[in-house]
């Protein structure tokens, strides 16, 4: 077990533009080291937005993208880890037995495991996400606009776990993945007009969306 909690945060952003165009880009990174050995988290994010007016205001183009990656090394069982650390015989060595290549343990206590054996457990997860969008606005006539919008989202979550025989009877390993993809597109035509004492506001809209989910998981033991 360690005794220092460490965390780093880094952010950077830059932007610029004019009356006809603008952009902004930002990046972020976070690194967190837990107080327990092999427990940590890393996260990276990026974001970009751009806007451009073209053809004397006839067309306005907007683009955006966001992405993130986060990786975690987790502690499987806080209770058993801290309970073992608090109750285990402190005179036992902090290394494996060179003859048996296993951790020394208390055979008469079924719920007390060598706390260093828990440090060999692997429980990792990673999440990746990306989202992009684009919007085109056409100023066709006075009061008449056409908007085209499209977006794509991709998300994947990966989990993996390894429990050696020193902490789990017969051992166990797990691997799983979940993916999600989403496509969205819409078209909107608007017309607004003042005529004498009347005001006309007409809207025509069409939209299409598709989502796909895939994944798998598997667990093995007795190794």
Question: Where are these predicted regions, by residue range?
Answer:
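A short catalytic or substrate-binding loop motif that flags glycine-/basic-rich loops and adjacent residues
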Residues: 6
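Surface-exposed loop/interface segments of Gram-negative outer-membrane beta-barrel transport/assembly proteins
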Residues: 2-3, 35-39, 45-131, 147-223
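Predominantly transmembrane beta-strands of Gram-negative outer membrane beta-barrel pores used
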Residues: 9-31, 35, 45-53, 62-64
